[in-house]
Amino acid sequence: FHTLKDLDTSDGDMRKFIVKGIFEDTNNYMKSGINLRKLINKMNDKVDFIDATQKHTFNDLYEGMLKDLQSAGKAGEFYTPRPVTNFIVEKVNPKLGEIVLDPACGTGGFLTSTINHFGKINTVEEYELLQKSVNGWEKKPLPYLLAMTNLILHDIEVPQIKHQNSLARLYC
């Protein structure tokens, strides 16, 4: 993905910064990008991301994929089941406009539970608050990529996920 790593961001487009940042530390293990291109084309043809029902279905599929990709216990990585993240978020009860930080966000499970907890967003002001409310840090490249994608699928235009180690001396 060298083209994505070297994406020109001189025009200030935040989405280009996101894509460039995501692929900065990611290695391409594919022998050919043809299958990836076919998958992207098929998704573009079949999934209407504006239709709420289709988007919800795609989000559910993506969440299921994330769960399956977790390497339970390997290298200290654990998938927190959605009922657990939902329960914890419910007990913390964050309000829209408060800053929520997950310093080891993995694929973004706690953050998406937080977004769902906020409920329906009705105004432009609420939408702008939502964009600033959920924040995360993730050290590893693949979970970082998945968290960014997960938040984009949950209507966060420019996810506030930083690719950094929360246990580094700078943050302790």
Regions found by a protein language model. Give the residues of each.
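Non-catalytic, mostly N-terminal accessory regions of nucleic-acid modification and defense proteins
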Residues: 1-96, 160-170
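Conserved S-adenosyl-L-methionine
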Residues: 77-172
